[in-house]
């Protein structure tokens, strides 16, 4: 049995899913969206993402965190923002000792 926390990062909405793999069988355990208020300062939004991901790690005790790679077209500003959300997620994984993979 292996539990993995999957993350689709973003500063406005960060999606997550928790999956249990037993052999070749997969089961969804949890999933949702971490939403932040665009009117809040960025540092507070990132702190909210970090805190919620840390809570999810403590609740589900995953063997790993899988985080979506950074993809962007023409909008470098969006890519920078998503990169900051990725950093908040990676910090949660690092501080709880859970390996993080892209």
Question: Where do the language-model regions lie?
Answer:
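Phosphate- and other anionic-substrate recognition elements at nucleic-acid/protein interfaces
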Residues: 1-102
